[in-house]
Amino acid sequence: MGHDDAHVEAVERAMVALRRSQSRRTLARLAATRRRATVAAAAPGAGVEVLDAIEEAEESGVPATVTSVAAALGIDQPRASKLVAAAVAAGLARREADQADGRRALLVRTPAGRRLSAEVHAFRRQVADRAMAGWSDRDRAQFARLLTRFVESLGAMTR
């Protein structure tokens, strides 16, 4: 295994560990230890992920739909439809008629969904801040830059 292969292997292992550390169960345990259980348990099923997908669409200026949620989450449309329905039933999102195409429903976050999104972002940032406790500002900046670049490269591969 060459020098570069060892680095790629280290990244792959770190990605697996990161994915495990971001599971609903792990985050719920962490939230409970930080007395933030409402953040981890407030959304049904993958409700937080649905809110993330809708928020991403809102920020990009492209209306969110079940199809865009499915693409963002990497799941099929029937599964996305069920997750969206659960988020709507929980009062976190709502469907609105597309004024340009009445057959299409657009998804938007409700005020409750926006509040939950803000809470989740704050919680995730606290977790990241805690994980980087003791890091220098330079290390934090370098990590943020490299991780962002890595994620952008991964995204470009799937488009």
Predicted regions and their residues:
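Pre-recognition alpha-helix immediately N-terminal to the DNA-recognition helix
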Residues: 48-55, 115
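Charged, amphipathic alpha-helical coiled-coil/dimerization segments
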Residues: 85-141
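Short, locally clustered residues in the helix-turn-helix/winged-helix DNA-binding domain
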Residues: 20, 52-59, 121, 148
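A short acidic, leucine-rich amphipathic alpha-helix
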Residues: 68-71
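N-terminal leader segment of winged-helix/HTH proteins
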Residues: 1-48
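Amphipathic alpha-helical dimerization/coiled-coil segments
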Residues: 25-29, 33-36, 123-156
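Key DNA-contact positions within bacterial/archaeal DNA-binding proteins
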Residues: 78
